[in-house]
Amino acid sequence: MNQGKIVQIIGAIVDVEFPRNNVPKVYNALKIDGTAIILEVQQQLGDGIVRTIALGSTDGLKRNLIATDTGHAITVPVGTGTLGRIMDVLGNPIDEAGPITYTDQWEIHRNAPSYEDQASTTELLETGIKVIDLMCPFAKGGKVGLFGGAGVGKTVNMMELINNIAKAHSGLSVFAGVGERTREGNDFYHEMKDSNVLDKVAMVYGQMNEPPGNRLRVALTGLTIAEYFRDEKDSSGKGKDVLLFIDNIYRYTLAGTEVSALLGRMPSAVGYQPTLAEEMGVLQERITSTANGSITSIQAVYVPADDLTDPSPATTFGHLDSTVTLSRSIAALGIYPAVDPLDSSSRQMDPLIIGEEHYNTTQRVQQTLQKYKDLKDIIAILGMDELSEDDKLAVSRARKIERFFSQPFHVAEVFTGAPGKYVPLKETIRGFKAIVDGEYDHLPEQAFYMVGNIEEVIEKANKMTA
């Protein structure tokens, strides 16, 4: 058993001295005698000294305490016993429901599947949210980013996606809360409980109040649990299709920045860690589908100061299949979900994948919205009366499209009092195609606001004129 002693403690950083001929590997977990604290080796400084990051508070630690090398990385429980439970970064239960019964324990540092093991599918994943299904469709086994500044609805959108997909998909989900509000974690737990889908969700939380080491590693803990479900073959000889929700990827980067500064690395652009791209790659490359099973990941990405060129969101962009950009200006109009249809994109936007009708409808909707955007300056200066009849018609349709993108959410029922709506993809395409074809030019634009399918628009318009 390899033992060393603590020689220095600076906040979350602990230096431990081991015999020179038996230094622990980087990422090995160290246990400290008499405490529940786990240290993770980050650097080997020479002379037998390793620099570690503490996963937990270092209060009460002192020099010369004995640290034991476990000989492996941090391990967490995996298997069906994790479903319906809330765990911390080390896999300890934090929901006061007794110990977790686990099938196995896996290390959180793992290699991504090899290139020949990976599989890509082009099957669409219906979300029931009109603007997403039409403008930036999701792929099963793909990666989706929800980009947005503070308070534009990333978490609410993610909750609705979980509500819609987890129920319809009826597969397994893993939720990793990375550096977010504890209140949101609590709300999420009760939301899942009330929806009766708790037995299909494993939750891993490392919230805002926890040390940077916990927040940096909690995403890997959640991912490891998801990988087990994907890779472990059931009676049919196949793994499972898993949904992995990460809220919030930016906090993962931020925790890496804090750890990097504590380790004394020279910061790069805007104060981020020099290893930003590598750290992001380590996480994202493991989120993939194999011939055995798939991981579909939906990640909330906080955009600092609404600047999409900030290194953190910019690095995340390259790993994603679909990007859903939430806009403050659209939220200011009272249109929720505040998705910017011209700024959101998807690799699935191909007629061979989504079909001719869907593709053509989306293109026409984009053209109409772009035309309205181009005319906004003229309208602001000269007013609507100076526009040609064609332009007036385009503006009228664009405003109807904008309002038809709004939709009442199931998870927001408690706040709005309006029952949530799930709109199938076929209904969505039919509704928007009819608007751009001019079938509803005679209806007032208010009738298109906060409804489900196009039939509800007609019903609302009839009530308004009655």
Curated annotation (Swiss-Prot):
- Any one Gene Ontology molecular-function term assigned to this protein's record: ATP binding
> What EC numbers are recorded for this enzyme?
7.1.2.2
Q: Provide one Gene Ontology cellular component.
A: proton-transporting ATP synthase complex
Which positions bind ATP? 148-155
Record keyword Cell membrane present: yes
UniProt entry keywords in alphabetical sequence: ATP synthesis, ATP-binding, Cell inner membrane, Cell membrane, CF(1), Hydrogen ion transport, Ion transport, Membrane, Nucleotide-binding, Translocase, Transport
- Location in or out of the cell: Cell inner membrane
> What does the annotation say about its assembly with partners?
F-type ATPases have 2 components, CF(1) - the catalytic core - and CF(0) - the membrane proton channel. CF(1) has five subunits: alpha(3), beta(3), gamma(1), delta(1), epsilon(1). CF(0) has three main subunits: a(1), b(2) and c(9-12). The alpha and beta chains form an alternating ring which encloses part of the gamma chain. CF(1) is attached to CF(0) by a central stalk formed by the gamma and epsilon chains, while a peripheral stalk is formed by the delta and b chains.
Q: Write the protein's name.
A: ATP synthase subunit beta
Organism name: Xylella fastidiosa (strain M12)
Q: Which gene encodes it?
A: atpD
